Amino acid sequence: MYWGGSLADNKSLRINGSIRVREVRLVDAVGQQCGVVPTPEALRMARDINLDLVEVAPQASPPVCKILDYGKYRFEMGKKLRDSKKRQRLQTLKEVRMQPKINDHDMAFKAKHIQRFLDEGDKVKVTIRFRGRELAHTDLGFNVLQNVLGRLVCGYSVEKQAAMEGRSMSMTLTPKSKK
């Protein structure tokens, strides 16, 4: 039976003596419904098998209570919460910068990094920075971006096409969703 600990972390659940209604709809330890039972009798049934009476649906009329091990129940709920937080990964924006006069090996290296970022589930912003008179040859930057796209393995989609932004040209790639 659950004896200690504060319920400050889980105020919505009432257990054992803190259930203050006259009668409850009872679900026993195996999951079978026992019907509407007076609260003192439900508490006695829970104590007889050395478990707790936990109010799982206080909004229902009458409230639904279940006979279970409260410590184990809290552990399972915490485990579910941790697992859901673990799976909930935020998508971040990574930026890879290049110049229009990029060497072939350097481009392959950058393309490999872009592919890794996409495989990890991140968005990637590919930026070509123009310096000085390179700004007159924006077509070279566009060719570099097309070359990078050609080197990538499928598994991405272009969110924002190549466009000039001041002295740089950028394009945003997103990973395709895994279904």
Swiss-Prot record:
Keywords, comma-separated and alphabetical: Cytoplasm, Initiation factor, Protein biosynthesis
Molecular-function GO term, any one: translation initiation factor activity
Alphabetical list of Pfam families matching this protein: IF3_C, IF3_N
KW Glycoprotein (keyword) present: no
One example of a Gene Ontology biological process annotation: ribosome disassembly
UniProt xrefs under PROSITE patterns: IF3
Cited InterPro entries: T_IF-3_C_sf, T_IF-3_N_sf, Translation_initiation_fac3_CS, Translation_initiation_fac_3, Translation_initiation_fac_3_C, Translation_initiation_fac_3_N
Localization annotation: Cytoplasm
Keyword Transmembrane helix: no
GO CC entries: cytosol; membrane
HAMAP family, sorted: IF_3 (MF_00080)
PANTHER family per UniProt: TRANSLATION INITIATION FACTOR IF-3, TRANSLATION INITIATION FACTOR IF-3, MITOCHONDRIAL
Summary of the function given for this chain in its UniProt record: IF-3 binds to the 30S ribosomal subunit and shifts the equilibrium between 70S ribosomes and their 50S and 30S subunits in favor of the free subunits, thus enhancing the availability of 30S subunits on which protein synthesis initiation begins.
Sequence similarity: Belongs to the IF-3 family.
Subunit text: Monomer.
Protein name: Translation initiation factor IF-3
Taxonomic source organism: Treponema pallidum (strain Nichols)
